[in-house]
Design a protein with these regions (language model features):
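Terminal helix/beta-alpha structural elements that buttress the NAD(P)+-binding lobe
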Residues: 3-145
Length: 145
């Protein structure tokens, strides 16, 4: 529900607009300010799946924890880590369901293709600075392998 809003200063405001009744479930990939905003709006018994924390992957010093982590206790929320490799055996099932949802228009995605191996470093760095939307692909060759 926050999509592009995690790059702005108005995270809580944006979340409140899109989730006026609070947040029951969060699939967290960003961390940092986005996680702080979510924690400020979690409902009683909220469930949070922690899949990534991209906001701190390139940190050069220890990253402080969420400033309002006490809300997890107050709201009796649950947080569980999720590593996709733990579910690799279910990949065919996931591919089948996701393909069907895509065909039905229930899910969409964005892809940006950047040409040239010489652009790989800058393109990969965009994963961490928030200057992209969707998937980034570096096209290194016109020829098939």
């Amino acid at each position: 529900c926050i999509r592009d809003s995690y790059r702005t200063e108005r995270l809580v405001e944006s979340l409140r607009k899109h989730c006026p009744n609070g947040i029951d479930i969060d699939f967290e990939n960003v961390g940092g300010a986005a996680l702080d905003a979510v924690l400020s709006l979690i409902n009683l018994g909220a469930r949070m799946v922690l899949c990534g924390l991209i906001s701190q992957y390139n940190a050069t010093r220890p990253v402080p924890g969420p400033y309002n982590f006490a809300n997890v206790l107050i709201q009796r929320a649950r947080i569980e880590g999720f590593i996709v490799l733990d579910y690799l055996h279910r990949a065919p099932e996931a591919i089948s369901a996701l393909s069907e949802w895509f065909k039905e228009g229930k899910i969409r995605y964005r892809v940006e293709v950047v040409d040239g191996l010489e652009n790989a470093v800058d393109t990969i760095n965009r994963l961490f600075d928030g200057s992209h939307q969707g998937k980034l692909i570096v096209k290194v060759s016109q020829e098939p392998w």
